[in-house]
Amino acid sequence: MANYYSDHPEFDFYLNHPEMKRVVELKERNFADKDKYEDAPVDFDDAIENYKRVLDITGDIAANILEPNSEAVDLEGPHLVEGRMHYASKTYENIEATRQAGLWGISMPRRYGGLNMPITPYSMASEIVATADAGFQNIWSLQDCIETLYEFGSEEQRQKYIPRVCAGETMSMDLTEPDAGSDLQRVMLKATYSEEEGCWLLNGVKRF
């Protein structure tokens, strides 16, 4: 069977980079999870093998599910049903396949249900998914938006949202500025916290 990871050995160039050892040590916090989680690596070599296994699973799904589904997704497309947007039926099949494989929340800590992988192998997985279906990659890679909440959100917010993203249950990017569209560089809206009002004030133009 085809595999969009193992069929392209050049991908391993990134994992073999000398800086990866330091990247892994930082992400794994010197392998502090090894006594807490069965799937946590015990050293650098173990971590790299973990990443390769995840990439191999990604490559298998990409070649044998995502790519074969891509034409049907394009032909059916998303559509409105009673005022709600629905993906093409094969898109839901793709989401379920990646969800069942545990390919959501890849970079999130294990305590939230993630795989705690660095951005480098996550980006490799994203490229593999895009090779099969660039449109689905845009949906699947929305999971990295949760990095912002992880870095700046409260623990209560993390506990509420991150496990759901790691389970493949939710994630979206909603742009409502008339001149921005999918171009994030053109977003002009500013959010300013008002101490007097005790809330965030949005300054700009939004269209819903």
Task: Name each model feature, range by range.
Residues 1-81, 85:
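Extended, charge-enriched "interface" segments that sit outside catalytic cores
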Residues 26-31, 69-79, 108-110, 137-142, ...:
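Short coil/turn segments at secondary-structure boundaries
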Residues 40-51, 75-80, 104-111, 123-132, ...:
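Glycine- and acidic
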Residues 59-60, 90-159, 163, 167:
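Internal helix-loop-helix
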Residues 63, 67-68, 130, 150, ...:
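Charged, amphipathic alpha-helical interaction segments
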Residues 83, 88-96, 187-193:
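Conserved beta-strand/loop block within the catalytic cores
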Residues 115, 156-208:
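Glycine-rich, Trp-frequent "lid" loop and neighboring beta-strands that shape
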